[in-house]
Swiss-Prot record:
Pfam families: Fe-S_biosyn (PF01521). The gene is erpA. NCBIfam families: iron-sulfur cluster assembly accessory protein, PRK13623.1. This is Putative iron-sulfur cluster insertion protein ErpA. It comes from Paracidovorax citrulli (strain AAC00-1). One of its GO terms (molecular function) is iron ion binding. Binds 1 iron-sulfur cluster per subunit. PROSITE patterns: HESB (PS01152).
């Protein structure tokens, strides 16, 4: 009797969701800067009214411990410390009556401030 091994592949969801809307806005901002080497760096740092706050910046350098995601030709960088707080999060870009901003929906956050830019775990 022979055993047949089945090769079952399941597609794992991305640990962080980078929406089409966010990628499109980042692409627009990079085009405005005129530097195609720019990548969006998303990070978490201490501060804000809830203990931690999100930050966004452009970076040309990918560090050794960065997680890199690419969506529609746009690269997103997350450092190792921030990654642990962002696993499962969605990074989106919204335009509404309150203005235009990048928004992070983070299932790890137990509380968030009213503006959504700081959180606690």
């Amino acid at each position: 009797m022979s055993a047949v091994a089945e090769n079952i592949q399941t597609e794992m969801p991305a640990p962080i969701v980078f929406t089409d809307s966010a990628a499109a806005k980042v692409a627009d901002l990079i085009a405005e800067e005129g530097n195609p080497d720019l990548k969006l760096r998303v990070f978490v740092q201490g501060g804000g009214c809830s203990g931690f706050q999100y930050g966004f910046t452009f970076d040309e350098i990918t560090n050794e411990d960065d997680t890199t995601m690419t969506k529609n030709g746009v690269s997103l960088l997350i450092d190792a410390m921030s990654y642990q707080y962002l696993v499962g999060a969605e990074i989106d870009y919204k335009e509404d009556l309150q203005g235009a901003q990048f928004v992070i929906k983070n299932p790890n956050a137990t509380t968030t401030c009213g503006c959504g830019s700081s959180f606690s775990v």
